[in-house]
Amino acid sequence: MAPQNKVTTSGKDNNMDKQKALEAALAQIDRAFGKGSVMRLGSREKIEIDTISSGSLGLDIALGIGGLPRGRIVEIYGPESSGKTTLALHAIAEAQKAGGTAAFVDAEHALDPVYAKKLGVNTDDLIVSQPDTGEQALEITDTLIRSNAVDILVVDSVAALTPRAEIEGEMGDSHVGLQARLMSQALRKITGSINRSQTLVIFINQVRMKIGVMYGNPETTTGGNALKFYASVRLDIRRVGQIKDRDEIVGNATRVKVVKNKLAPPFKQVEFDIMYGEGVSKMGEILDLGVKAGIIDKSGSWFSHDSVRIGQGRENAKTFLREHPEMTEKIEKMIRHNTAEIADEMLDPSIPED
């Protein structure tokens, strides 16, 4: 028995020595690099992730945390005219509604202030930059993030971040890997600042086709692989259909897939309407999510809630909800109470991560 007690005492002493050595190491790091350079995760005052709404109720549910995460990088990519900039502008509008400051780095030189205003963006307070080169765009991005005064920053788009050497060179000159190196260097530099400033940084990206790919997905995004690694959330947005009013096309049916999510389970997908001149249709989302949650009954082409007929056909039902805000608000509250059930239905295991 005596030797056993000896071993136990020796083990306790060893643990105490380890603890003292750890405390000394932590104190040394704090002295060298400043207080808070290293800490126990449980000692942090706030562990929950702050979010900014995407402007789409369905997408907020699919993201699993109630919106787009602050202090992180988000990539929105897809084909041309799929709604990438529209989604980013909706996020800006939501941030501004909450009293935040927004910035838009317009590398494509294609921002339409009239359309942005229609989506709810306060264009008078929006900080806009139209840089000449990719280096200039990313330097401006870095400076705005380091100011700790910007809540959301959108870069539109990665494909338009042209390196200075390419702009100053001749047409036809080869500049292999220049843009990828530029993005890789910039992301290494700004990631720490983004986390400290709690800025939501959205990079809009385009898709390209890989040449000679016979099997698997031939699509890839521009700017190399760095953004894929640094992004906490990657959203693939696609136009999947047209919305018509008789013979006139008035909008697009849009599908967004969460192909990467470091903060909640990924591989969820959501569909919503993007109406021309209006953006994401809130009424359309409430209608679709209400049906998914069993709050709105759909019988044939008729929609009803609490035995009250909302309308025949989707567009008529949307008009009814628009004209009855009390019912719309009630249904929206019920949807928000059933987010877990709705999120389970959004799972799409077929989504590949490229």
From Swiss-Prot:
<dbReference type="GO" id="GO:0006281">
    <property type="term" value="P:DNA repair"/>
</dbReference>
<dbReference type="GO" id="GO:0016887">
    <property type="term" value="F:ATP hydrolysis activity"/>
</dbReference>
<dbReference type="GO" id="GO:0003684">
    <property type="term" value="F:damaged DNA binding"/>
</dbReference>
<dbReference type="InterPro" id="IPR013765">
    <property type="entry name" value="DNA_recomb/repair_RecA"/>
</dbReference>
<dbReference type="GO" id="GO:0009432">
    <property type="term" value="P:SOS response"/>
</dbReference>
<dbReference type="GO" id="GO:0005524">
    <property type="term" value="F:ATP binding"/>
</dbReference>
<keyword id="KW-0963">Cytoplasm</keyword>
<dbReference type="InterPro" id="IPR020588">
    <property type="entry name" value="RecA_ATP-bd"/>
</dbReference>
<dbReference type="InterPro" id="IPR027417">
    <property type="entry name" value="P-loop_NTPase"/>
</dbReference>
<dbReference type="InterPro" id="IPR049428">
    <property type="entry name" value="RecA-like_N"/>
</dbReference>
<keyword id="KW-0238">DNA-binding</keyword>
<dbReference type="Pfam" id="PF00154">
    <property type="entry name" value="RecA"/>
</dbReference>
<keyword id="KW-0227">DNA damage</keyword>
<comment type="function">
    <text>Can catalyze the hydrolysis of ATP in the presence of single-stranded DNA, the ATP-dependent uptake of single-stranded DNA by duplex DNA, and the ATP-dependent hybridization of homologous single-stranded DNAs. It interacts with LexA causing its activation and leading to its autocatalytic cleavage.</text>
</comment>
<dbReference type="GO" id="GO:0006310">
    <property type="term" value="P:DNA recombination"/>
</dbReference>
<dbReference type="InterPro" id="IPR020587">
    <property type="entry name" value="RecA_monomer-monomer_interface"/>
</dbReference>
<keyword id="KW-0234">DNA repair</keyword>
<dbReference type="InterPro" id="IPR023400">
    <property type="entry name" value="RecA_C_sf"/>
</dbReference>
<comment type="similarity">
    <text>Belongs to the RecA family.</text>
</comment>
<feature type="binding site">
    <location>
        <begin position="78"/>
        <end position="85"/>
    </location>
    <ligand>
        <name>ATP</name>
    </ligand>
</feature>
<keyword id="KW-0233">DNA recombination</keyword>
<keyword id="KW-0547">Nucleotide-binding</keyword>
<dbReference type="InterPro" id="IPR020584">
    <property type="entry name" value="DNA_recomb/repair_RecA_CS"/>
</dbReference>
<dbReference type="InterPro" id="IPR003593">
    <property type="entry name" value="AAA+_ATPase"/>
</dbReference>
<keyword id="KW-0742">SOS response</keyword>
<dbReference type="GO" id="GO:0005829">
    <property type="term" value="C:cytosol"/>
</dbReference>
<dbReference type="GO" id="GO:0140664">
    <property type="term" value="F:ATP-dependent DNA damage sensor activity"/>
</dbReference>
<dbReference type="GO" id="GO:0003697">
    <property type="term" value="F:single-stranded DNA binding"/>
</dbReference>
<keyword id="KW-0067">ATP-binding</keyword>
<dbReference type="Pfam" id="PF21096">
    <property type="entry name" value="RecA_C"/>
</dbReference>
<dbReference type="InterPro" id="IPR049261">
    <property type="entry name" value="RecA-like_C"/>
</dbReference>
<protein>
    <recommendedName>
        <fullName>Protein RecA</fullName>
    </recommendedName>
</protein>
